[in-house]
A protein has these predicted regions:
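Flexible phosphate-sensing "switch/lid" loops adjacent to ATP/NTP-binding sites
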Residues: 1-332, 338-355, 362-363, 370-376, ...
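A generic structural signal for well-ordered coil/turn residues at beta-strand boundaries
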Residues: 8, 211, 238, 296, ...
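Active-site proximal loops enriched in glycine and acidic residues that flank catalytic Cys/His/Asp
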Residues: 16, 46, 219, 246, ...
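Cysteine-nucleophile active-site neighborhood
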Residues: 22-25, 29-33, 37, 349-444, ...
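Short beta-alpha connecting loops at secondary-structure transitions
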Residues: 62-70, 248-252, 358, 379-387, ...
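Short, basic, helix/turn surface patches
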Residues: 66-78, 239-247, 409-422, 515-524
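C-terminal and late-domain segments of enzyme folds
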Residues: 440-444, 448-538
């Protein structure tokens, strides 16, 4: 759709109440998608109330996946949703934490920027929060900045962010809108939905000085008109601005569900903008239609050590789903714990898989299971995709079992190994701090013509995002290639090996980068597309 000129950037804040994990990120991404479909330039940012500077050092069991932006910032997994919905890259400015806010304020205090004043939460912390909110809208790059406030209203750690929203609503006037997402529980014994938690959540928000313009009610099933009217009355919100977000088979149906309730139109009306005709969203609908039409199944295994947590490999899961749909297949994803697989049971766990992904990660735990899985997959020519540590494990297994390098390993796992086929990158050897110091962000990669991976991308020069400290040891490169593991992707500036594949196998590819970070609903990453095609043709 043709772009629309907006005089002032509009700011939409999305807060949550009652409980966490209601789907503020999905609602934010869905609203952003609807506005984008109308021709507006939209970006979404996430404010997380934890004191970590970023989630880069957080255990996936604590936080889920760590997403990496195009400029190399480690962020919350919600940014992955933003990118997959909007088909646009995010940057450091799209992810802010309490830790970063405080770090910035303390750095300013140390420089003397506050001229000897007492530094306090109000105004210094709130001013820094507001500065970061406005940063994305300052250069006239976006018509809408949607800001998701992490956590739940009433949490002590969220108070400075809610106060900042209150101040911004006063400062921005009609250029600002507040959407509050709450939960409406169903009480089985009484056989009815209860709105009291929503009323109390809105009351808490009002006590903090913020009156929501729009409510989104999360519920398992559709709510009746009387419940919506009651919520509108007691929460002081217009009836048409009470939107419901019920459980649907896939998160990608949420934009259409919100569009049917005119959420984007209501937002435009409240912001004083022309509504215009409702966009068709045809490419999005086509994607959902393909999902519903698919009947044949592709069975993919994911071997990793964090499989107990649903969100630990979120971008990989979604990338596999999207690629499967575009290959007209339903995805049957089997999660295989790398600590529970060995040579004895590998056949039992892997034999009926159409393809297997060896997941990324860090540390010694679970790698021996990955070696066992890789050995079975290689020997039985089952399509395999290794990502980051997954690629490194493919290299180590090949070194041990094909090259005969006994004890070959990564210096991450065994600093004393006699055959460090994976070694710490040279520029990492003097790094002391853990946070934000890896090789992060987008780098160039040149692919070897005639390779499977080059055929998948359809071009020789690509860019992908990275998150690692260790790399393939080029001292072993000739031996690997002579034995059949080809180094088919390299960084053109450093010679760092970015991709390997084994000659003679249908699809046995490992990549040092993370292709899942660039796969979106309307633009699936070619590597996942190629992998699923290989799995289908197994």
């Amino acid at each position: 759709m043709k772009g629309i000129i907006v005089a002032n950037t509009k700011y939409i804040f999305v807060t949550g109440g009652v409980v966490s994990s209601l789907g503020k990120g999905i609602v934010s991404a869905s609203l952003g998608k609807l506005l984008q479909a109308r021709g507006y330039r939209v970006t979404i940012q996430k404010f997380d109330p934890y004191i970590n500077v970023d989630p880069g050092t957080l255990n996936p069991y604590e936080h889920g996946e760590c997403f990496v932006t195009v400029d190399g910032h480690e962020t919350d997994l919600d940014l992955g949703h933003y990118e997959r919905f909007l088909n646009l890259p995010t940057t450091r400015a799209n992810s802010i934490t309490t830790g970063r806010i405080y770090q910035s304020v303390i750095d300013k205090e140390r420089r003397g920027d506050y001229l000897g004043k007492t530094v306090q939460v109000i105004p210094h912390i709130t001013d820094e929060i507001k500065r970061n909110v406005k940063l994305l809208g300052a250069k006239n790059q976006f018509d809408f900045v949607i800001t998701e406030i992490g956590g739940t209203v009433g949490d002590i750690e969220s108070l400075p962010f809610i106060e900042s929203v209150r101040q911004l609503r006063w400062e921005l006037g009609r250029d600002c809108l507040c959407v509050h997402l709450t939960y409406v529980p169903f009480i089985a014994a009484a056989k009815e939905y209860k709105t009291k938690p929503t009323q109390h959540s809105v009351k808490q928000l009002q006590e903090l000085g913020v009156q929501p313009d729009m409510l989104v009610l999360r519920a398992e099933h559709e709510l009746n008109a009387e419940i919506l009217r009651k919520v509108a009355l007691f929460c002081n919100v217009s009836k048409e601005a009470v939107i419901q977000s019920v459980d649907v088979p896939t998160i990608y149906e949420v934009p259409l569900m919100l569009q049917r309730q005119r959420m984007d139109s209501i937002a435009l009306e409240k912001l004083g903008l022309e509504v215009g005709p409702t966009p068709e969203l045809n490419p999005w609908k086509d994607f959902l239609d393909r999902m519903k039409r698919a009947t044949d199944v592709v069975r993919i295994g994911l071997v990793g050590k964090y499989v107990e947590l649903q969100d630990a490999y979120k971008s990989i899961d979604e990338s596999l789903l999207i690629a499967s749909i575009y290959n007209d297949r339903k995805l049957d994803l089997r999660l295989i714990h790398s600590e529970k697989i060995n040579d004895a049971n590998a056949a039992e766990l892997l034999a009926d898989m159409d393809g297997v992904v060896i997941a990324p990660g860090f540390g010694q735990r679970g790698v021996e299971g990955k070696f066992a899985a890789i050995r079975y997959l290689r020997e039985h020519d089952i399509p395999t995709l290794g990502i980051c540590l997954g690629m490194q494990c493919m290299v180590i297994e090949f070194a041990r079992d094909v090259l005969g390098l006994e004890g070959a390993n990564s210096t991450e796992m065994d600093p004393q190994t006699l055959h460090p086929v994976i070694d710490l990158m040279e520029d990492q050897k003097n790094v002391v701090n853990m946070g934000g110091t890896m090789r992060l962000g987008t780098y160039d990669c040149t692919l070897r013509p005639g390779s499977h991976i080059c055929a998948a991308y359809g071009k020789e020069h690509i860019q992908e995002r990275h998150r690692h400290r260790f790399e393939f040891n080029n001292e072993y490169k000739d031996r690997f290639e002579a034995a059949g593991m080809q180094c088919v992707g390299e960084n053109p500036d450093t010679g760092l090996v970015e991709a390997v594949e084994v000659s003679g196998l249908r699809w046995f590819i490992g990549v040092q980068y993370h292709p899942e970070y660039t796969s979106t609903v309307l633009s699936p990453n070619p590597l996942f597309m190629g992998f699923i095609k290989a799995a289908i043709n197994k």
